[in-house]
Amino acid sequence: MIVLLGAGAGYYFWTQQPEEPLPAPISAPEPAPADAPAPQASAQPEVRYPVPATEEAPAKSLPTLENSDPMMRESASTLLGRKAFEAMVRPTHLVRNVVATVDNLPRETAPTRVMPLEPVPGRFIPSPEKNAARYTPYVRVFEALDARALVQRYIESYPLFQQAYAELGFPNRNFNDRLVEAIDDLLAAPELASAPELVQPKVLYEFADEDLQQRSAGQKIMLRMGAENAARVKNKLREIRRELVQR
């Protein structure tokens, strides 16, 4: 499938803490008066990472975004193996959930309700060593992915991802740019000499170090999975990034 386990890989390692409530929706602004001059359309931003050319044309045309789940399930099952797919992947709204997850990872929060992967089994353990051990089987699955095949499937299906990104509210932006940006943000996660200290001011655990707590959602996921797991995930992310930008 796509980059379901690429930039979105960090969601394998989501801690099972209760999700913070979302802020109230922002009301739409009042429409401008009828005689107000129309604003000038802003120029489209430069595309930094064009989608690489496919090595061969897809054998058949793509389904619509609404009907894309069967194709995506088949692709993900082929890449991951059926057993891992059934245990780890949420089987509906795959393209939209991948796009939302990729877009959220570099942000402050990343709601679990739109992630394409099932949370790690078991409850969050505030002991860094014990908590990291829960993720090792998932890291092995991620490491075993064929980066070239993963990116090839993503490229062949790219129009669906771009459409979902436009529907998310970014009609003039390139989703592939956001994907590379999300991968780069994960790769920039701090590499600590020792496990970070956690505190529990209310319901949720937080990093005691304010700098770590202010990091992006994706980087905090990398920190929570433990240094060894994070290093292994970063190695695979580098492979995927090379395939995305050097074709």
Regions from the language model: what does each represent?
Residues 189-193:
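Conserved functional acidic sites
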Residues 86, 109-117, 149-154, 165-179, ...:
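Surface-exposed patches in mature extracellular/periplasmic domains of secreted proteins
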Residues 194, 198-247:
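A cross-kingdom marker for long, charged
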Residues 9-22:
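Hydrophobic single-pass membrane-insertion segments
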Residues 73-85, 132-144, 213-219:
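Acidic/histidine-rich, surface-exposed loop or edge segments in extracytoplasmic proteins
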Residues 23-130:
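N-terminal Sec/ER secretory leader and immediately downstream segment
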Residues 123-177:
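Mid-length scaffold segments of soluble, non-membrane domains
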Residues 1-8, 161:
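Hydrophobic membrane-insertion alpha-helices, especially the h-region
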